Amino acid sequence: LNRAEIYSKAGADAILIHSKEKTPSEIFTFAKAFKKSRNYIPLVSVPSTYSKVYEKDLIKNGFKIIIYANHMMRASYPAMLDVAKSILINKRSFNAEKKISSIKEIINLIK
């Protein structure tokens, strides 16, 4: 809390609070104390470990920004592993075609 207050006084645009806990109680306690200290800069949450919390509860507790930091990367790994296994098992990529984007889709994406 002290560090957040110092950052706020120094002109920080937001305060990102992270926690290794499995529940959001620690960050909710911080948010309540931060609000009492009359700091009005936005609070940012990164709910990686406390993933059961709903956005509405983060918002209700004073968080203005929610960052899902690495979920897309973590989701891509099982998909890549599945395609790699298919190619190794079948000795060709044809069997994995239904699981992947077409070349046309990728080209359109990067245009």
Where are these regions (language model features)?
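Extended, intrinsically disordered, low-complexity segments
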Residues: 71-111
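Alpha/beta enzyme core
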Residues: 1-68, 74-85
